Regions:
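C-terminal lobe helix-coil module of Hanks-type protein kinase domains
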Residues: 177-263
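Activation segment signature within eukaryotic-like protein kinase domains
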Residues: 117-118
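AlphaC helix of the eukaryotic protein kinase fold
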Residues: 47-68
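Activation-segment/catalytic-loop signature of the eukaryotic protein kinase fold
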Residues: 80
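Conserved short submotifs of the Hanks-type protein kinase catalytic core
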Residues: 84-98
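Protein kinase catalytic-loop region centered on the HRD/HxD motif
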Residues: 123-135
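Conserved N-lobe ATP-binding subsite of Hanks-type protein kinase domains
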Residues: 25
Length: 290
């Protein structure tokens, strides 16, 4: 553990601890050169556990993966310092509170607000999925989404994100968060559609206040709140289809429906069918009178 007041690399002064995991501690630090606050993740290279090397390598992989990314909804990594014993990862300090804390404090959130958050998350996930190779986040849930004071959001905790490798048939046997992770995440290959499933469960949780980890059987959102729109219910139901081929196939497709939920309701589909019947009748009559 780094003592408060320690200056790392001649410029990052440790102010206070703001979080910790199994082999890492996160501090708030002040860059004395730029007069700017950063979050500094301290990673000890050796501990007492037999899986320490695996954990350290995972944390380093997370840092190196994030360092090459640049998106407003993702935290930036600006420096990685290795003194031989400890690795320090310097990243954006994100003010605000996680969406799970918002749920705990205020309960289920308004549909309009949840859609706005989901649109931002779709854009961030689409950015990750568009990398070469694609990056699969694999742990979307309210606890991993920070709501900033100005209302925008950032995705945090890339500890189990990975670069997609098509030839690797199994990669996620014990990773992910139960209730949010799709079936394939526990038995085989994950891809962009796995993140879409977790985003659907995240939207469901935000709209209903029902934590999917509680063991409650899945029920469409309007069974919990009939005031929600049919459009958002259909969108979420499609996101969380057990079979990946039945879900949205990309976040861009999902984003389009989130921006136009009225287009997928039953009323819209009925109107389209009526238009098609009318068109077919018109064409048939035209042929008759030729």
């Amino acid at each position: 553990m780094t003592e408060i007041g320690t200056v790392i690399d001649g410029k990052y002064e440790i102010l206070r601890e703001i979080g910790r995991g199994g082999m890492s501690i996160v501090y708030l630090a002040m860059d004395t050169h730029l007069n700017k606050q950063w979050a500094v993740k301290e990673i000890r290279k050796k501990g007492n556990g037999k899986n320490d090397e695996v954990v350290v390598n995972s944390l380093l992989a997370e840092a190196n993966m994030m360092k090459k990314l640049d998106h407003p909804a993702l935290p930036r990594i600006v420096d990685i310092i290795d003194n031989g014993i400890t690795i320090y990862v310097v990243m954006d300090y994100i003010e605000g509170e996680s969406l799970d804390k918002v749920l705990n404090e205020y309960g289920a959130q308004p549909e309009e607000q949840v859609i706005a958050w989901a649109e931002q998350l779709c854009e961030a996930l689409e950015y990750l999925h568009s990398q070469k190779p694609p990056i699969i986040y694999r742990d979307m849930k309210p606890a991993n989404v920070m709501l900033k004071p100005e209302g925008n959001i950032k995705i945090i905790d890339f500890g189990i994100a990975r670069e997609y490798k098509e030839q690797k048939l199994s990669d996620t046997t014990v990773l992910g968060t139960k209730g949010y992770a799709p079936p394939e995440q526990y038995s085989g290959q994950t891809d962009a559609r796995s993140d879409i499933f977790a985003l659907g469960m995240t939207m469901h949780h935000l709209l209903t206040g029902i934590d999917p980890r509680s063991g409650e059987a899945y029920a469409p959102v309007r069974m919990w709140n009939p005031q929600l729109s049919e459009g958002i219910e259909l969108i979420i139901n499609k996101c969380v289809e057990p079979a990946a081929e039945n879900r949205y196939q990309s976040c861009s497709d999902l984003l389009y429906d989130l921006e136009h939920p009225e287009l997928i309701t039953k009323d819209y589909k009925k109107k389209q069918k009526r238009k098609m019947r009318s068109f077919i009748t018109t064409v048939a009559l035209a042929i008759v009178f030729l």
